[in-house]
């Protein structure tokens, strides 16, 4: 990806695991600088999913412009590609108004796709697949994995020797493109992301404190009506467990409880555990990112630290 030049408009990315305080910090930033908030959250795109997605309340939305929330109903789907298109459109509008987009959220895939685009892989080829299947019958999939290791060691390292489906697909891409699948995946739809990005990451200095926050947060959601929220969505939209909205952390566990698959106590336990696992994945994404300005989300005077950092970047005229 070619980097935008210094004349490109600025954008601030505020990223972090769930329960790290992103939303509160976004409000503080918006009260100090001419920004508009763009949600980067795969649950907040859904209407009626307010409590479990921790949407800002109506008064905050009136005070501070928020974008990309309440886009679709819970029985609909929303892709990373759609997010990229919508986000770029919204960001262009914010910039045209002389303001700075402040992108806030924890859906790390959305952040990545927004900046890097989506890689395009060739469609399946029946003839190549038949040839690969024949070779596998003769040699076995572990031997095919060895072939893949020579052609694309990066991808082979991620695939188990008996994972026939993924081995076949990786080899198929190699044969169809003449390039390793790992190289193809780096080729993005867009050469340039037309913004200078300032990446701010909230990283907990003490993971156990973040875990305690997650437990308290989930309990608060239950206290203020998460079960009733999911019940209304289930009854009004006839959603099922395999729909994207009900695969969101918290919603899945409450849905299982409403379907009498688990008890109330188990729902709470599973909800907290799933949220902690989500936070772990989010932190893994963040630690793999480049050009990241990290702040301890548990630090005292965190808002002042981040506001001071933004001021030093001379983002605003």
Swiss-Prot record:
Gene, per the UniProt record: miaA
Residues bound to substrate: 18-23
GO biological process terms, semicolon-separated: tRNA modification
Highest taxon in the source lineage: Bacteria
Lineage, top ranks: Bacteria, Pseudomonadati, Pseudomonadota, Betaproteobacteria, Nitrosomonadales
UniProt keyword annotations, A-Z: ATP-binding, Magnesium, Nucleotide-binding, Transferase, tRNA processing
GO terms, molecular function: ATP binding; tRNA dimethylallyltransferase activity
Residues the record lists as binding ATP: 16-23
Ranges for region Interaction with substrate tRNA: 41-44, 165-169, 247-252
Stored NCBIfam families: miaA
Name listed for the protein in its UniProt record: tRNA dimethylallyltransferase
PANTHER family: TRNA DIMETHYLALLYLTRANSFERASE
Function, in words: Catalyzes the transfer of a dimethylallyl group onto the adenine at position 37 in tRNAs that read codons beginning with uridine, leading to the formation of N6-(dimethylallyl)adenosine (i(6)A).
Cofactor(s) of this protein: Mg(2+)
EC number: 2.5.1.75
InterPro entries found in the cross-reference section: Dimethylallyltransferase (IPR039657), IPT (IPR018022), P-loop_NTPase (IPR027417)
Site-annotated residues for Interaction with substrate tRNA: 107, 129
Family membership noted in the UniProt record: Belongs to the IPP transferase family.
Catalytic activity: adenosine(37) in tRNA + dimethylallyl diphosphate = N(6)-dimethylallyladenosine(37) in tRNA + diphosphate
Subunit note: Monomer.
Top EC class, one word: transferase
